[in-house]
């Protein structure tokens, strides 16, 4: 199942979407490991911005360490609710502080985005 597609029509749409993404970025990510290509493909698909194929950097141990963290059900921290809601089958806790009262206060005080303030509040 790709991107939550569970019906035949949904799978066909998802397959076509994946083909379009691969046609746009395939050459730019061919040097990556298969797991890393999958990550970048999903980023490009969800943002609808092929430029992320060139902007995304994946550290050498990212796939291994993130897989370990997921297996251990460690908390996931995100700066926006759309991502929090999209992580809907995770057994650990997914946290987002974008609407926390301190986030609003901090963003005004420091004249920073709420997303940046949310990360400060979380830490």
Residue ranges and their predicted role:
Residues 77-123:
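Conserved mixed alpha/beta catalytic, RNA-binding, or beta-rich assembly cores of soluble enzyme
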């Amino acid at each position: 199942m790709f991107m939550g597609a569970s019906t035949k029509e949904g799978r066909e749409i998802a397959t076509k979407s994946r083909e379009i993404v691969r046609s746009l970025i395939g050459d730019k990510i061919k040097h990556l490991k298969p797991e890393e290509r999958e990550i970048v493909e999903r980023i490009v698909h969800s943002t609808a911005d092929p430029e992320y194929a060139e902007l995304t950097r994946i550290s050498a141990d990212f796939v291994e360490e993130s897989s370990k963290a997921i297996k251990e059900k460690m908390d996931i921290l995100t700066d926006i609710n759309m991502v929090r809601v999209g992580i809907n089958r995770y057994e650990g806790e997914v946290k987002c502080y974008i609407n926390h009262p301190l986030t609003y206060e901090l963003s005004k005080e420091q004249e920073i985005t709420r997303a940046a303030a949310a990360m400060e509040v979380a830490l």
